[in-house]
């Protein structure tokens, strides 16, 4: 049986998961009575909500005499290390674009890697049922993008499939709907070359990890050369060249949405999962027992940002979560680095705190959000960028920032970004919207999204990706306003909040429990202000002629986890529990903060 391994590249919300659902339905993988959660690929709750793929999945379908392994790629450059490993398993890629929007900035990052690896591209223009969409323009934009990424002539001669995965069809022309997605499957078989036979000694690069509480870590990868069978003795060639030996206890193939155990000998081209290996990492090679030869290892992206993770020691600790001790935190973090390779963890002088290094705010916030849902309580310090010395000079990570915004707001956006030492690279007008491209230090990105969304009335689409390390740009001048800090522990009273509204904006609602030292709002001025919001109104037995004043309180500002991480200052923590996200000063008592300031 021939095998085709194909990776899918798509921007958030361009219909990738729906398309895979359709292909699975077409090959009747669901029994008619089986309840299927829509969005099969995004298997983790967070992925479904955020619409991003974090870890790649494998799904496999059979069509005629061919087995097609569909590999999902993460669409965001924070997960860049994952992208390159996944593409190494593929023979070709499906580039999925929205007929209305065309290819988006994040897609560019993954596509560039695919072209560099010499993979054949099939372009799928999806959502052609959208009103006002321009499928031909979208295709034209893909051609320009691939041309600008130095695609070869053969790569530029790509097949195009039009369709609507929502309505369940794919065809040759966008204006003639078909009845199913057969045309897409036929195109894959015709244009993507099957894996060629590659006899010789075994070579398989470990591209991803699975974990089972029964068998431990499972190595997943594509057999590059030779063959493998249950019971084989193999060697593991690590990235640094060290050798370990192991036996293949169990071997699994991907079928449909799951894995099937096999006792057959599996030859090169197939993607397998191996149980029974120890001492391995992603990027290592599973090789022949007698003549081990390692494949060239793939560089894993270096972390660009670090954050302090520490146990929750606020006055409200232990109220919401079930995992609150430093042992819980340590175990969970060290378990995470087994499969999340772009993370690094460093112990600090305190046994309760750890420095966690990652690829960016999104990368770190996904970890925190996952832990929060598992029942952890923890606190986070201000994110800091990871600088390094190059030839004796300090260098910092620089990112490319893409902002799509309505034309009338473009001036405001440019002003906000350039204040943070961002350089404008490109302005492209598309009807009444503008695409802006900047180069900005990773420090300048922290806390940038909020002011941009405020200035554009929530209309901007912001994305960014890592570019390179460049010389340190000096201090950033822009500072946020000071904090409104709670004076006492208790319940916030509407009357007090109302009387203090002229001092700033609040992050809490009336009747919310708060503690001394909690950051409950933002001051209108640059310095911090301690306020008492648990004071009630003094009552007298005299009736006022105008009856009581009604309170009218502006709605509280509520932060998402990422926004809170970007917002806090150096002397603040984000307190994260399964039910709450609070901001607080590291030193809760005012006299301690004053003493430290004067020290």
Predicted regions and their residues:
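P-loop NTPase switch module centered on the Walker A-proximal segment
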Residues: 1-97, 101, 141, 209
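Canonical P-loop GTPase G-domain recognition
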Residues: 120, 130-190
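A short, contiguous, amphipathic alpha-helix enriched in charged residues
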Residues: 314-337, 550, 554
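Long insertion/accessory domains within large nucleic-acid-processing enzymes
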Residues: 254, 258-260, 395, 440, ...
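Conserved nucleotide-binding/hydrolysis modules and their immediate coupling elements
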Residues: 203-307, 317-319, 481, 490-540, ...
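Interdomain boundary/hinge elements
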Residues: 35-41, 149-161, 195-205, 241-254, ...
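Short glycine/threonine-rich beta-strand-turn micro-motifs
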Residues: 164, 348-363
């Amino acid at each position: 049986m021939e095998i085709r391994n194909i990776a899918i590249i798509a921007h958030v919300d361009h219909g990738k998961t729906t398309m895979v659902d359709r292909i699975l339905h077409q090959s009747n993988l669901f029994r008619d009575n089986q309840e299927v959660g829509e969005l099969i690929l995004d298997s983790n709750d967070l992925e479904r909500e955020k619409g991003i793929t974090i870890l790649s999945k494998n799904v496999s379908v059979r069509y005629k005499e061919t087995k097609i392994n569909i590999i999902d790629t993460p669409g965001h450059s924070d997960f860049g290390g994952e992208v390159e490993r996944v593409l190494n398993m593929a023979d070709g890629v499906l580039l999925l674009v929205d007929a209305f929007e065309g290819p988006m900035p994040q897609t560019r990052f993954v596509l560039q890697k695919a072209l560099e690896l010499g993979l054949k591209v099939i372009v799928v223009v999806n959502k052609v049922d959208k009103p006002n969409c321009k499928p031909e323009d979208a295709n034209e934009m893909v051609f320009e993008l691939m041309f600008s990424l130095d695609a070869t002539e053969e790569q530029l001669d790509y097949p195009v499939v039009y369709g609507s995965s929502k309505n369940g069809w794919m065809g040759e022309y966008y204006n003639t709907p078909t009845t199913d997605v057969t045309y897409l499957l036929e195109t894959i078989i015709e244009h993507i070359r099957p894996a060629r036979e590659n006899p010789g000694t075994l070579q398989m690069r470990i591209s991803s990890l699975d974990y089972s509480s029964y068998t431990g870590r499972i190595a997943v990868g594509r057999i590059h050369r030779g063959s493998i069978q249950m019971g084989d003795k193999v060697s593991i060639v690590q990235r640094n060249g060290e050798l370990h030996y192991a036996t293949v206890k169990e071997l699994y193939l991907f079928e449909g949405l799951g894995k099937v155990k096999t006792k057959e000998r599996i030859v090169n081209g197939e993607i397998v999962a191996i149980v029974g290996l120890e001492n391995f990492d992603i990027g290592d090679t599973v090789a022949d027992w007698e003549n081990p030869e390692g494949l060239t290892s793939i560089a894993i992206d270096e972390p660009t940002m670090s954050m302090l993770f520490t146990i929750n020691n606020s006055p409200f600790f232990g109220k919401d979560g079930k995992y609150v001790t430093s042992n819980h935190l340590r175990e969970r973090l060290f378990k995470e680095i087994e499969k999340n390779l772009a993370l690094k963890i460093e112990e600090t002088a305190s046994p309760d705190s750890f420095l966690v290094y990652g690829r960016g705010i999104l990368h770190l916030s996904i970890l925190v959000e996952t832990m929060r849902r598992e029942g952890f309580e923890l606190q986070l310090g201000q994110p800091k960028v990871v600088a390094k010395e190059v030839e004796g000079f300090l260098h910092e990570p620089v990112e490319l920032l893409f902002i799509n915004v309505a034309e009338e707001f473009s001036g405001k956006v440019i002003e906000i970004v350039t204040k943070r030492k961002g350089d404008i690279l490109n302005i492209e007008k598309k009807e009444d919207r503008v695409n802006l491209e900047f180069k900005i230090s990773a420090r300048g990105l922290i806390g940038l999204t909020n002011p941009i969304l405020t200035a554009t009335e929530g209309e901007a689409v912001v994305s960014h990706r890592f570019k390179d390390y460049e010389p340190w740009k000096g201090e950033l001048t822009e500072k946020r306003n000071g904090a409104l800090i709670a004076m006492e522990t208790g319940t916030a009273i509407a009357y007090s909040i109302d009387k203090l509204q002229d001092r700033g904006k609040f992050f809490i609602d009336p009747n919310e429990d708060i503690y001394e030292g909690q950051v409950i709002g933002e001051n209108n001025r640059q310095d911090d202000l301690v306020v008492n919001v648990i004071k009630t109104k003094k009552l007298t037995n005299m009736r006022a002629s105008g009856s009581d004043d009604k309170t009218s309180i502006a709605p509280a500002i509520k932060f998402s986890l990422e926004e809170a991480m970007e917002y806090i200052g150096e002397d603040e923590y984000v307190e994260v529990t399964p039910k709450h996200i609070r901001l607080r000063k590291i030193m809760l008592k005012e006299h301690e903060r004053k003493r430290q300031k004067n020290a």
